[in-house]
Structures are given as structure tokens and as C-alpha cells.
Amino acid sequence: MNVSFSIAPYFFKERRAKLNSFRKRKVEIVAEIDSLLKNSSSLAIVEYRGLTVNELEQLRKEFKSAGVLSKVYKNRLFKIAAENNGYLDLQTDLVGPNLFAFGTTDAIAPAKIIAKNAKEQPLLILKGGIYDNQVVSAAENALISALPSYTEALTMLASGLQSPLKQLAFGLKLLIDEQKITA
């Protein structure tokens, strides 16, 4: 009987130490999520239930090539970090297996990549997220994915400014060729 009492304190001490290490790791993960939420320009939450490992790896490769950080976190830990940063409305989207895509360089890139892949893989569901420090719904995230990226917008602007000048130059060249005006 005394033997069982002498083993018990050792067992509970070891178990308590293991639980403390798990708790420390969870605190570190919440701090990591906090940092990502503060430093990233956008966040898209994706449900990936039913995807194969190869499909998920391909999605992650696309994210990486676009400068998007993608990670899987426990929803409970993400809820804690979201509450710490004032994103209480995200809690409704934190159900099921979720992949969190943080836009670091281009704010629209996560939503664009997910929308493109969702056409090929219907099991990929774009949920809500954060854009411009505002919580957005799945519908708003879909609208954001339709927006042009920064470089695409600049290209559209440049071509819009260039088009009238090209038409003027072409018209003047035709008039010169027909010799209605002299150069």
C-alpha cells in the first residue's frame, strides 16, 4: 500500500510537467497567429474537407509561389488569437478542417488562388476572412477574388492611357499617307 503512494507523486509530477509543456506550446502557437494577423495584409479561410494530399500540396505550392503563407491551425487556438485582435466575427467560419492563407505581399492573392482552384476542385470552399483589417464574409471574399491585382490594375490603367494616343498617331499617319496633310 505504501508503494502505490510513493509512485503516485512521481506519476502526477511527470504528467503535470507534460501538460505544462503542451500549454506552453499552445501559447506559442497563439502568439504566432497573433503575429500573422497583425503583420499580414489579408486572410482567407478555406475548408479543405475531402481534398487529397496531392491536391492540398499543389494548392500550398501555388500559395507559396504567390507569396502567400498557408497553415493549418486548430480552430480553438485561432479563435483565441482572433479574439485577441478584435476579429470576433470570424468565429462562425472556424468550423471544420480549415486552411488559413495569409496574404503577405498581395492582399488579393489568397482569395484569387482559392477561387481559381475552387472551380477545378468543388470540395474547396472559400469561407470568410480578413481584408483591410475588416472581417469579410464568404460572398465578400468571392467579390475580392474577382478584383484585379495591383500589377493587373496598373497594366489596365497604362493601356487605357495609351489607347487614345495610339489611335491619334494612327489617324495622323493615315492622313499623311493620303497626303491630306504634310508632316
From Swiss-Prot:
Entry's family note: Belongs to the universal ribosomal protein uL10 family.
Organism: Mesomycoplasma hyopneumoniae (strain J / ATCC 25934 / NCTC 10110) (Mycoplasma hyopneumoniae)
InterPro entries: Ribosomal_uL10, Ribosomal_uL10-like_sf, Ribosomal_uL10_bac, Ribosomal_uL10_bac_type
Phylogenetic classification of the source organism: Bacteria, Bacillati, Mycoplasmatota, Mycoplasmoidales, Metamycoplasmataceae
Recorded name of the encoding gene: rplJ
Protein name: Large ribosomal subunit protein uL10
GO MF annotations, alphabetized: large ribosomal subunit rRNA binding
Signal peptide limits: none
Biological process according to GO: translation
Protein role: Forms part of the ribosomal stalk, playing a central role in the interaction of the ribosome with GTP-bound translation factors.
Keyword field: Ribonucleoprotein, Ribosomal protein, RNA-binding, rRNA-binding
Self-association and partners: Part of the ribosomal stalk of the 50S ribosomal subunit. The N-terminus interacts with L11 and the large rRNA to form the base of the stalk. The C-terminus forms an elongated spine to which L12 dimers bind in a sequential fashion forming a multimeric L10(L12)X complex.
